[in-house]
Amino acid sequence: MYFVRLLRVANMTCIINKNKFDESSYNKFFSYLLEGNRRQCISFINDCIESGLGLKEIYILLLQRALHDIGDLWQKNVVSVAQEHLATAIIQRLMMFIYQKQALPSPNGFKVLIACPGNELHEIGARMVADFFEIHGFDVKFVGSNIPVRDVVGQIKAFSPDLIGVSCTMAFNLHEIKNVIDAVRETNANVKVFVGGYAFNKNPGLYKIAGADFYAADAEDALAKAKSFLLERGAANELSC
């Protein structure tokens, strides 16, 4: 069922339905982002929050789309590396701002480790996934980008996660993903591993070659599929939606 909200965002009426921001509102935000205007971006996000939007909606409907769009513009040489990096830094700041305003639920008893493998410097998508799991009651360890295999193994031994998520943006790092997953299997054959990121979005079937249990298109998809795997273990009464 589709829902519609009339919001006052950045001094204009913004219509939010299940799938997207009103184009004029999105374009306004995206122009602030391209300009590197962090103050206006924060003001826009604050208005969204005050109007009733939560982390899930803002991450998926606004920030995720903006990241994809800025990446496309960079690939087409429309924006510079500096502009792309500035936009990414602003979005990371916005994510911190949004996260701090969320009320965390009671723990559901499950642990998730999220990492980006060696040579993978793009971590913002993985951070979104980590935040999604945390606001749904998971105990999350997000260890960031460029993590050596030995350190992933060390975290598995110390943390004993039920799930491990590994992100890969650049296709040339896929072998690093496989190295991580091979090490995970040797360390704990029972833990479930999922993968995501731009490299897998372009070719979802690669998750099988990498040895993962499933591929997730985004944070929302990762959460839904993770719950499905855990439900198979008889955890229905422990997971909250």
Model-derived features with residue positions:
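Long amphipathic alpha-helical segments
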Residues: 3-106
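Residue-level detector of anion-binding/catalytic polar loops
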Residues: 54, 139, 190, 213
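Long, low-complexity, intrinsically disordered polar/charged segments
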Residues: 101-116, 182-188, 193, 226-227, ...
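Glycine-rich active-site/cofactor-binding loop and its immediate structural neighborhood
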Residues: 107-143
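Cofactor-cradling patches in redox/metallo enzymes
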Residues: 132-134, 142, 147-205
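Peripheral docking tails and interdomain loops at the edges
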Residues: 199-241
